[in-house]
């Protein structure tokens, strides 16, 4: 999964040559857990922000035609906002993205029942989807990896499922999202990112 946001020439020269990953407070969960925001900057001055709550892509800042950094991804300014609003801004969706009709399916001859949360169907794995969970974060050079252990039966899905979502900001101005998962049983794994883009930028 790769998002390419390229400019022919970069005008933000004061950050040129600097690559960094910074961590800061981003609020607390309803359980009182501390939420962190990770800001990744490449050598061209492009900025990507992600959070360990929901492994969410919060913002992507690129220079506009006047060289002013502009956010082209819709998101919130505080971690608490992601817990009370439901447009799924930037969220990591899983185990399953989209709808499962009647909130049930058959796997290996067994009926699997999920929680209905939209007109009798299961949308984005229900009210306890990956986007509402805290993820373990590991910072790397120009990247942040988020890990989650989804135990057997979580959201109703079978199998212990260990998943990693890695966000990378490259020096050719690409945001890359890499998914990796392993389960000890046959299960459903249909993950995605739910970002909304406004390429004109927003405040």
Which sequence ranges carry the predicted segments?
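Surface-exposed acidic/polar loop and edge beta-strand patches at domain peripheries
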Residues: 15-203
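Extreme N-terminal basic, low-complexity initiation segments
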Residues: 2-7
């Amino acid at each position: 999964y790769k998002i390419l946001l390229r400019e022919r020439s970069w005008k933000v020269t004061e950050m040129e040559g600097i690559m960094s990953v910074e961590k800061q407070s981003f609020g607390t969960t309803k359980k009182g857990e501390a939420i962190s925001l990770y800001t990744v900057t490449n050598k061209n001055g492009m900025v990507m922000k992600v959070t360990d709550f929901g492994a969410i892509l919060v913002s992507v800042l690129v220079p506009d035609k006047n060289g002013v950094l502009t956010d082209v991804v819709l998101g919130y300014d505080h971690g608490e906002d992601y817990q009370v609003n439901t447009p799924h801004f930037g969220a990591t969706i899983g185990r399953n993205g989209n709808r499962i009709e009647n909130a049930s399916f058959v796997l290996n001859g067994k009926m699997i029942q999920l929680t209905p949360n939209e007109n009798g169907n299961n949308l984005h794995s229900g009210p306890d989807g990956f986007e509402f969970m805290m993820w373990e974060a590991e910072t790397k050079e120009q990247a942040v990896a988020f890990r989650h252990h989804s135990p057997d039966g979580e959201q109703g899905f079978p199998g212990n499922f260990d998943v990693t979502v890695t966000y990378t900001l490259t020096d050719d101005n690409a945001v890359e999202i890499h998914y990796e998962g392993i389960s000890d049983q046959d299960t459903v794994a249909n993950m995605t990112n739910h970002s909304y883009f406004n390429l004109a930028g927003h405040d």
